[in-house]
Amino acid sequence: MIPSNQINKRLMGFMKFWEDYKPIAFASEIQLHHKDIPFCGTADFVGMITNPKTKKSDITLVDYKTGLNYPVHQIQLSAYAMIWNKLFPKYLVTKVACLHLKSTWIKSPTYTLKYYDIDYDLVKNCYD
């Protein structure tokens, strides 16, 4: 069981992300599957995210993580984007990211939003 103080710190990091990026949710915990694609998955968040530095907004698919960053996350996120974009062509995902929520911060809540390139070839190479 995860201690409540670790859960609280991760939630506070999530709240800090929400304040910084002001996302507008299109979907949360949406199960993604399409008859033409041989895999499925559940996207944690899809919505409009505005970069606080550039003020540019993009439809972004985000997966929440509490562990380390791994290269395989790019495959997972690209696969989810592939399905989403097939299902919702009027609302194409143009960015994918992992939101890493840590419980180790001391003074103030922190998070890391790690963007990945969407790479459909990388996904196809996993199942071809």
Where are the model-predicted features located?
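Nucleic-acid nuclease catalytic cores
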Residues: 4-5, 30-127
